[in-house]
Amino acid sequence: MDALRRHSLLIILFGSLVVTLAMGLRHGFGLFLEPISSELGWGRGVFAFALAIQNLLWGLAQPFAGALADRFGAARVVVVGGALYTLGLLCMGLSDSALGMTLSAGVLIGLGLSGTTFSVVLGAVGRAVAPEKRSMAMGIVSAAGSFGQFAMLPGTLGLLEWLGWSAALLALGAI
């Protein structure tokens, strides 16, 4: 296997892993709605507002994350996005106020998602793979996001039932 092909396969593999984790964790947040709202005595609106902010920032920040990836490299943007995502999960697990939940689940994770999901990762894959293999490579990485939902939800639910919502979020942040 030549070096270029090995490099392309590594980008596809690591890109798929990043998207699997990012999307798998993100789509598990609904499992936390009831336990967080019940334990902290909030209405569901606090958690829903935090996730609405997350979606808004995720969408708004993607063009900027893409521009940063073009300028500084996708790997750096993915690392920073992953760090923001991790920090958001850890802060979310320690949050006991509406503001804390909005800043962690909303702002930090929303910005983290912009650096760890499709816009940055697919851009890197598109640059690394030969044109005749590009569609297949992008399809594999995109499918990894769906696989993440399938694979991560049972584990997230298991952690939630075993550890409770706060410790489960801390454990997911450690991943």
What do these predicted regions represent?
Residues 10-44, 62-65, 153:
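Extracytoplasmic
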Residues 27, 55-63, 116, 149-150:
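Residue-level signature of mid-helix packing/kink "hotspots" within the transmembrane helices
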Residues 61-73:
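Helix-to-loop junctions at the C-terminal end of transmembrane segments
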Residues 83-96:
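C-terminal ends and interior cores of transmembrane alpha-helices
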Residues 94-104:
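Helix-loop junctions at membrane interfaces in 12-TM secondary transporters
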Residues 105-143:
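Cytoplasmic helix-loop-helix junction between adjacent transmembrane helices
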Residues 141-175:
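Helix-loop-helix hairpin linking two adjacent transmembrane segments in secondary transporters
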